[in-house]
């Protein structure tokens, strides 16, 4: 779990996302409150529930990007889902409980990686001994029994060569565990739990079989480390720790929640199904127990962050019960031409940096001047204003169109230099930007 302060979280988000100060502050406080809650005594800790967040803002302003970056910072089980992927119980499609089941899989994977790191040194030692046993097999006595090889000097010599990588390309034959047979079972919606149980049963029937395999020592060492680490990790404890981490620190990000709103004045059957998805989400957000293949998961203390553009619907179109479960509202602002200039230059691995690096691989040096960047930003903003406003995503379209010619010819122009200034941008984009019909179809 992340121990970063809200200021540190905002600073980290600032490296990748321009503007949206309020949204960054809200998610940073929510993330820090997870840590604060864990410092409380047992009884009080159970009473402190997370304050779920609803992010409202037009498309392309950074809602999803905040979620992506938050996932890396959280160091906790995190899942991002699209609300439109789910259907009401009884309809064909995924049920909302699969969110928690998928999150449980993520939590177990994270716990496995953490536990494997703890035993990595012991696993490496055990794998090393197994390889040395293959390289220096113990001699057999007259009764066919294996005797311990007492020549420690030879073993140490081989150990030194092994650690220095001198034996990496030597082939050896080792016993490796066969991967468990994966059985794909197609089941109707709502039967995911039964499917998981059947798959587990078939995997157990296959057992842990081994077979001899000829591999280079470098590859064999990796396989043996994985085998030894799996043997050293207690699987039951691992699952228990994963579920504990999920229940106390889990975060669910639900994108496009506005698409499951019942629009005002609409009485279509599709809207009924959408409202059903909201009602199915309620128990999860409110706190319920979900059955997963790793065990029962309580959702009482999982943090839910929902986001939507709310262009066709309003937050008040959500069912009242769900509105009440999303107490913190954050509005993200539409991006201006000035924001576009910052997006092109300030973030880590900005768009201009990416194009410079990509064309550098062909030997072409690209230089973006300040007036060139300003003209690109202005062009993207103009197209957004005249057609559909898709936010910062418009920059990708404009940049791809602008760099199309040099990207195509780059392999034949190795050693050349290209300066992208205002004149270059005007020559390549002006007609498209000024002509609204062309903008609609090309940009």
Swiss-Prot record:
InterPro entries the UniProt entry points to: AAA+_ATPase, ATP-dep_Clp_protease_ClpX, ATPase_AAA_core, Clp_ATPase_C, HslU, P-loop_NTPase
Biased composition (Basic and acidic residues): 143-154
CDD domains linked to this entry: RecA-like_HslU
Tagged with keyword ATP-binding: yes
GO molecular function: ATP binding; ATP hydrolysis activity; peptidase activity; proteasome-activating activity
Predominant place of localization: cytoplasm
Segments of this protein annotated with the region Disordered: 138-158
Source species, domain of life: Bacteria
Any single Gene Ontology cellular-component annotation: HslUV protease complex
Residues reported in the UniProt entry to bind ATP: 18, 60-65, 255, 321, 393
UniProt keyword terms in alphabetical order: ATP-binding, Chaperone, Cytoplasm, Nucleotide-binding, Stress response
GO biological process: protein unfolding; proteolysis involved in protein catabolic process
Record has Cytoplasm as a keyword: yes
Subcellular location, record wording: Cytoplasm
Assembly and binders: A double ring-shaped homohexamer of HslV is capped on each side by a ring-shaped HslU homohexamer. The assembly of the HslU/HslV complex is dependent on binding of ATP.
Assigned protein family: Belongs to the ClpX chaperone family. HslU subfamily.
Physiological role: ATPase subunit of a proteasome-like degradation complex; this subunit has chaperone activity. The binding of ATP and its subsequent hydrolysis by HslU are essential for unfolding of protein substrates subsequently hydrolyzed by HslV. HslU recognizes the N-terminal part of its protein substrates and unfolds these before they are guided to HslV for hydrolysis.
Protein name: ATP-dependent protease ATPase subunit HslU
Organism of derivation: Pseudoalteromonas atlantica (strain T6c / ATCC BAA-1087)
